[in-house]
């Protein structure tokens, strides 16, 4: 029996925790639908979606996926796919944005004092002259609802939170 346990430990990686509260991204009915979908895919009912679960689910739909295809799907997750990871992955796909820490770290590259702020003029210059260049109109649109203080400092930590979770009500 102990040899079975040892073997199980070597084949399963420990699930990573999501960096943000993914359950806040969806209402209860959406979470319930995702849970039902997760349970339909988790064919062996072990609480994780693995390659075999994906194969069995796709086969039940009349598909015959290749091993490479299944590996590609599994590699989209940073670890074992439990329900929280499943919800996180779907949330990011549905919202079409990168994880919160990736966005925040992209801004942090230009925050020389690690303060959580970048002056709006400096950020405008960066956004309009580097990489996939923004137009001034696009920067203006971004700044319209952005957390910028009276000194012109753009709070990218708060902006990232708003981007991923929505703005707080003005009454809060």
From Swiss-Prot:
**Keyword Cytoplasm belongs to the record:** yes
GO BP terms, alphabetized:
stress fiber assembly
Q: Which residues form the EF-hand domain?
A: 29-64, 98-133, 134-169
Q: Which residues carry this modification: N-acetylserine?
A: 2
InterPro entries per the UniProt record, alphabetical: EF-hand-dom_pair, EF_Hand_1_Ca_BS, EF_hand_dom, Myosin_RLC
Task: Report which superkingdom the organism of origin falls in.
Answer: Eukaryota
Q: Does the keyword Repeat apply?
A: yes
Substituting residue 19 to D results in: Prevents aberrant myotube formation in PIEZO1-deficient myoblast
Residue(s) carrying Phosphothreonine: 19
Recorded GO cellular component terms are: cell cortex; myosin II complex; stress fiber; Z disc
- Molecular-function annotations in GO: calcium ion binding; myosin heavy chain binding; structural constituent of cytoskeleton
The compartments listed are: Cytoplasm, Cytoskeleton; Cytoplasm, Cell cortex
Modification(s) after translation = Phosphorylation increases the actin-activated myosin ATPase activity and thereby regulates the contractile activity. It is required to generate the driving force in the migration of the cells but not necessary for localization of myosin-2 at the leading edge. Phosphorylation is required for myotube formation. Phosphorylated by DAPK3; DAPK3-mediated phosphorylation is inhibited by LUZP1.
Q: How does it assemble?
A: Myosin is a hexamer of 2 heavy chains and 4 light chains: interacts with myosin heavy chain MYO19. Interacts with LUZP1; the interaction results in inhibition of phosphorylation of MYL9 by DAPK3.
Anything further noted? This chain binds calcium.
Q: What does this protein do?
A: Myosin regulatory subunit that plays an important role in regulation of both smooth muscle and nonmuscle cell contractile activity via its phosphorylation. Implicated in cytokinesis, receptor capping, and cell locomotion. In myoblasts, regulates PIEZO1-dependent cortical actomyosin assembly involved in myotube formation.
* Record's protein name: Myosin regulatory light polypeptide 9
């Amino acid at each position: 029996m102990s040899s079975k346990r040892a073997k199980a430990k070597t084949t399963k990686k420990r699930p990573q925790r999501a960096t943000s509260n993914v359950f806040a991204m969806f209402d209860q009915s959406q979470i319930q639908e995702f849970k039902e979908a997760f349970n339909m895919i988790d064919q062996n009912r072990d609480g994780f979606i693995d390659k075999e679960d994906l194969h069995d689910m796709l086969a039940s739909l009349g598909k015959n996926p290749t091993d490479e295809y299944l590996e590609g799907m599994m590699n989209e997750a940073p670890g074992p796919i439990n329900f929280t990871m499943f919800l996180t992955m779907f949330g990011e796909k549905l919202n079409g944005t990168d994880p919160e820490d990736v966005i925040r770290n992209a801004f942090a590259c230009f925050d020389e004092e690690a303060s959580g702020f970048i002056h709006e003029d400096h950020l405008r210059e960066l956004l309009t002259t580097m990489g996939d260049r923004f137009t001034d109109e696009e920067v203006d649109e971004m700044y319209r609802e952005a957390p910028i203080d009276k000194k012109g400092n753009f709070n990218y930590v708060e902006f990232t939170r708003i981007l991923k979770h929505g703005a707080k009500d003005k009454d809060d």
